[in-house]
Amino acid sequence: NVTASAVSHQIASLEQYLGKKLFSRSSKGVVLTAIGEKYLKEVSGALNIIGQATNQVINDIHQDYLRIHSAPSFGLLWLMPRLNKFRQAWPELKISLTCSYESIQFSRDNIDIDIRHGLSQWPTLVVKTIKNERMLPYTSSTYLASHSIQNIEDLLGCDLIHSDSTLINWSNWLSWHKVRGWNKNFIFNFDRSYMSIEAARMGMGIILESNLLAGQSVSQRHLAPVFTTDVSMPVNAHHFVLPHHNEQKEKVRIFFNWVSKELSREGFQI
């Protein structure tokens, strides 16, 4: 807070520096002189710029924050479980993570990296696609033990769970394997992969899901591939997207070096 006397002192100092009267004082208060009005008009733009820059600095919790926006399922199932490992490797670099399917604007939303799910269609941006991602059926060990599944056709008599968000669905996958006679009757339908994965973990049926997103559940033995043979279908569904100038930021380079190593441990590449 600034007192009235302090403001008056600053005005007097400015008027003395300029050698001009900026305010006219009377019993009714203080008003701008003609010179004061002209001066205000000239400097108001600069003052606004200073104000905006000040707010940006104040709102920036820490200049080393790496701001990531992610598709929800990737953020929850792949990135979140590994953030503590990143923190241990780079304790001075902090992360702000937001997850949604909303379209973001890098400058407006102050985002360094956007992890997107979908078809790659951003020609003006840097796009690093995760390679070796594949779609295959998963279920819980309890469901697998209680159902005799010897071949792909046996799936037609099982409880298939549908996920709206996957690029490859049951219809695509079954057609790829030339399976006929499917009536597209799902016992459950979810709009997020993490919901479908959780349903399968609970023994509610069989999902067609990405090995990238289901990987941790498999390693923890909450899920298992339905088939021991390779029946997977390739997909390029997840992408690290960013403006060209963001690629030059040290914190972004650090993150990509780290995430590249993490992905390579699991057989993926960017």
PLM region descriptions:
Residues 2-6, 10:
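Helix-turn-helix DNA-binding motif, specifically the short coil turn and the N-cap/start of the second
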Residues 14-15, 223:
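Conserved amphipathic alpha-helical core elements
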Residues 15-32:
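A short LG(V/I)-centered, amphipathic sequence patch enriched
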Residues 27-30, 37, 48-69:
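Short helix-loop hinge/linker segments at domain boundaries
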Residues 63-123:
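Central regulatory/effector-binding core of bacterial HTH transcription factors
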Residues 92, 211, 215-220, 229-270:
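C-terminal effector-binding regulatory domain of bacterial HTH transcription factors
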Residues 96-189:
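Acidic, Gly/Pro-rich loop/turn segments at junctions of secondary structure
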Residues 182-226, 230-233, 264:
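Hydrophobic hinge/microswitch elements
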